A protein has these predicted regions:
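N-terminal redox-cofactor-binding region of secreted/periplasmic oxidoreductases
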Residues: 1-173
Length: 173
């Protein structure tokens, strides 16, 4: 992994008053395969508004979220959350995902064990608390065009291993 190298954009937030003016980092890869190479395989898309701005910058009406989502969906073979994961709060929007692409995307049981995701009441309690105390919206699916809030994040970790997007595409050639 390239977390602590110049292969990481390492974006930093402005100081956050609610956490004592600390800043937080967002890892993003400068590699073929992008962030799947350095961030543990988190599978997130930008907000719809960010994609729609491309339409204005390029003067191309097809460079908006609605049109680009078709191509983003082609990259993934989404695996919906299991019954256990749904009970713990994981959810998704069917139209926000593809189901026949080269990348296995879902709520991996391996990541669940390593990161203790979906393994107790803590996850749901956290989301409920930040919504109640801070007004942070709970998101059904962070890849549906609105990622302003908090929710469970799918990963590019399949049943047995983490796979960077570059590897999946290069294996097909």
């Amino acid at each position: 992994e390239f977390v602590d190298t110049d292969m990481n954009w390492n974006f930093e937030t402005v100081p956050q008053a609610i956490i004592g003016n600390q800043t937080k980092s967002l890892r993003a890869g400068k590699t073929l395969g992008g962030s799947t190479s350095i961030n543990g395989g988190a599978w997130n898309r930008a907000h719809k508004v960010q994609y729609d701005m491309l339409k204005n910058i390029t003067s191309d009406p097809t460079f908006d979220f609605e049109h680009l989502q078709e191509y983003m969906n082609r990259a993934e073979s989404f695996v919906p959350p299991t019954k256990e994961q749904r009970k713990a709060g994981a959810d998704y929007v069917r139209e926000a995902h593809g189901y026949d692409g080269p990348l296995s995307i879902g709520f991996s049981p391996i990541r669940n064990k390593q990161k203790r995701m979906f393994t107790g009441e803590g996850q749901q309690a956290f989301l409920e608390t930040i919504q109640r105390v801070l007004g942070v919206a709970h998101l059904k699916d962070q890849n549906s065009g609105n990622n302003t809030g908090a929710g469970w994040t799918p990963t590019s970790i399949s049943q047995d291993s983490k796979r960077e997007s570059a590897c999946r595409y290069l294996e097909q050639t």
